[in-house]
UniProtKB/Swiss-Prot annotation:
Keywords: Methylation, Ribonucleoprotein, Ribosomal protein, RNA-binding, rRNA-binding. The gene is rplC. It comes from Cereibacter sphaeroides (strain ATCC 17023 / DSM 158 / JCM 6121 / CCUG 31486 / LMG 2827 / NBRC 12203 / NCIMB 8253 / ATH 2.4.1.). The modification N5-methylglutamine is found at Q151. This is Large ribosomal subunit protein uL3. Pfam families: Ribosomal_L3. One of the primary rRNA binding proteins, it binds directly near the 3'-end of the 23S rRNA, where it nucleates assembly of the 50S subunit.
Amino acid sequence: MRSGVIAKKLGMTRLFLEDGKQVPVTVLQLDSLQVVAQRTTEKDGYTAVQLGAGAAKAKRVSAAQRGHFAKANVEPKRKIAEFRVTPDCLIDVGAEITADHYFAGQFVDIAGTSIGKGFAGAMKRHNFGGLRASHGVSISHRSHGSTGQCQDPGKVFKGKKMAGHMGAARVTTQNLQVVRTDSDRGLIMVKGAVPGSKGGWVTIKDAVKKPAPEQAIRPAAIRAAAVAEETSTGGESNEG
């Protein structure tokens, strides 16, 4: 089982395929996505990787978190999430994950916080039909109708659909298809809508209801920081 990724929702647009069809897509960006920590069975009782995304100002980060990031030798991050993985899919701390982690045609599950709607009535919140527009109905046209039964059972059942707070909840949309990726700009474009507002953070994982993709890179599509530094150092020495 591979690690997922943290992405920022940039908005929606459309792409034109080779056959001329247009596809509505949501554009997601991997913003400085790095491995911050590892969780191992020997030390923690389970296997996982902790990822951080987005650059944060040091003054906006607590002292404990600053120490945590310093230990991993990465810059402070705005968003942190942990993903369970199998031992063979552990990623080195400090490695940067790129958009090539997913490929066009792959199905993914995306989770995020839905847009808050505030206090909503039963018709908007649960798609109720409401009461009649006339003929015996007074000031109750958009009400939900009966709340319970009679003396037996003498209560309102738990989970009864009524008016209440709507949105601002964690939502997972399954089996969204990746249409295109752009590794240079860190973009992943998926077909359809994704939970949350523009600028919100979402997590992307391989679809659990689809077979594990054979083309997927394991343990991940990474750009190790140490390798990048060695390459740049070698390039400078060669120029000299």
